[in-house]
C-alpha cells in the first residue's frame, strides 16, 4: 500500500517546529502505512519529519482529539529520541493522552 499525502492544513497542527536545535516538518496524510499496515502516525528522525494520518481507514476525517493525540504521541517519540532513549510506545501514548487532556481542559482568566 502507498502513502498518500494530503493538501489539507489544520490550524492546530504546526507545519514545522524546532526542538533540540533540530527543525522537524509535520506532514499530513490521507493514508499512511508501514509494511502495508495502516498507521495513525510515524516519527522519522532520519528525515526529521512527523507524519500524521488525518483520515479513518474508511476515508472519513478523524476527530481533532484523535489527530492531536497522534501528533503528541509522535512528538514525544521525538523527545525520547533526542533524550537518547528508546522509542517507548507506552510512554509516548501516556504522555500524548495527558497532553491532550491538558490542551482540551485548560482555561484562562480571559475565557
Which role does the model predict for each range below?
Residues 1-4, 105-111:
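Short intrinsically disordered terminal tails
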Residues 94, 98, 103-108:
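Acidic/histidine-enriched, beta-strand-rich ligand/metal-binding domains
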Amino acid at each position: 500500500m502507498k502513502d498518500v499525502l494530503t493538501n489539507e492544513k489544520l490550524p492546530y497542527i504546526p507545519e514545522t517546529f524546532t526542538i533540540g536545535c533540530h527543525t522537524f516538518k509535520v506532514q499530513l496524510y490521507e493514508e499512511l502505512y508501514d509494511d502495508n499496515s495502516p498507521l495513525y502516525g510515524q516519527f522519522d528522525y532520519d528525515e526529521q519529519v512527523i507524519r500524521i494520518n488525518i483520515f479513518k481507514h474508511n476515508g472519513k476525517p478523524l476527530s481533532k482529539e484523535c489527530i492531536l493525540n497522534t501528533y503528541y504521541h509522535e512528538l514525544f517519540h521525538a523527545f525520547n529520541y533526542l533524550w537518547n532513549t528508546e522509542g517507548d510506545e507506552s510512554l509516548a501514548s501516556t504522555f500524548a493522552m495527558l497532553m491532550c487532556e491538558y490542551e482540551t481542559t485548560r482555561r484562562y482568566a480571559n475565557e
